[in-house]
C-alpha cells in the first residue's frame, strides 16, 4: 500500500510520503511514537528510519519540526499520543472511529492548538482520476467503502503545513524536487 499512498499524497517539494511519526524521548533515548499496523506503539528510532530506502539506499525519511511559535503544543501532543498506545491501527483511514492511522494520530495530538487541517482524501490516480486498483482491492477485502472525498489527513498534507519547518533529510523521498 505504501506506493499507492505515496502516489496520492504529494508533500514537501513534491515528495511522496506514506508514513509519519512523532519523535519522543524515552529513558534518554529518542524513539518514534507512531500508528502502524497493528496498533499505536513506540518504535526504536533506528527501526523507524531504516524501514524504507531511496534509490541510493539511504533512508527515505525527512525530519520536520514545529516552528518555534508552536512548540508549546508539543508536551500535550506527546501526552495525548502516549495515551493512545496500544489502540488498534485504523485500516480504513477514517477520522473519529476510535482507531488511528499515522497522520490521524498526529492530527489529533495537535488538535487543541489547531496545528494541522483536514482535507478531502483521495484514492484516485492523479493523472487518470480513476480509483487505483490497489485501493479497490484493499477496501473490498475490508468489506467497506472507499472514503473518497471524506475529510482526512496524510503525511504529505502535514509536510506542507506552514507551521512545520523541514530540518533534515536522511535520503530523498520519491517525487522530491531538489
Report each predicted region and the residues it spans.
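Cysteine-nucleophile amide-bond enzymes
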Residues: 1-178
